[in-house]
Amino acid sequence: MTGYHGGKQRIGKYIADIINERLDNDITIKGYCEPFCGMLGVYSNIDNHPDIEYLAGDIDDDLISFWSSKSIPTTIISRPEYDMLKSDTSRKAERGFYGFYNGFTNKKFSGYFCHPNVNREKSRFLSSINRIENFHRKFPSANFSTGDYTQYSRLRNYIIYCDPPYENSRQHYLEKFDSEKFYSWCNAMSRHNIVYVSSYNIPDNLNWKVVWEKPIKNTCGTNINDNHRIERLYSVT
């Protein structure tokens, strides 16, 4: 995978280790779901059990088109090609990859980034392609769907991992995100599912348990005072 603005490429394995411990040992689990799948920084580290269902959703239609098509990018594109793709909304799958891959700080179509060293850029590109190919080999039947998290409101006996836009942060989202509504949804879903949520902090009135935390450097923020945060994984109880 390539990076994703606010994504979990660097710490995905740590989060997946917590989830896998439950996934591997609870025979009542019927499936695994990520309503904010992004570039699958956590998902790619989740264990594959052939007898359960794997779901992934995101509000970005280009991104879902890219994953659903199972297309594999073959070339590094130039700035003019990138700009042309930005204005061509018909090329959804390509936009779903290059928009983030070449976007500055991996924010979709934000500026243009390509490493000035040709060999290092080639290595960066091939590394992303290898991760994409590995994901499709590992999860050949994963089901991708465009929409917000509420499309999964009917799930029962699933593990649901959510990486929403963080409250009071500058993470990109296609529309204003209602954190309070999301928190209520998580509480409701936890009655019949196992729900995990990534965040820096949550409101004091939520009785959620921290099951993992790690100090990280925040590469998405523009305020130097916000560059170091503690990433936390909560179990919704």
Positions of predicted regions on the chain:
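Class I S-adenosyl-L-methionine-dependent methyltransferase module
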Residues: 52-146, 150
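Long, positively charged, glycine-interspersed low-complexity recognition regions
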Residues: 174-237
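S-adenosyl-L-methionine
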Residues: 1-44, 49
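Short amphipathic alpha-helix with an adjacent loop that forms part of the alpha/beta core around
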Residues: 20-24, 151-157
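Conserved proline-anchored active-site loop of SAM-dependent methyltransferases
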Residues: 32-46, 56-61, 101-104, 146-149, ...
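Active-site regions of enzymes building and remodeling cell-envelope glycoconjugates
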Residues: 51-55, 72-73, 157-160, 205-219
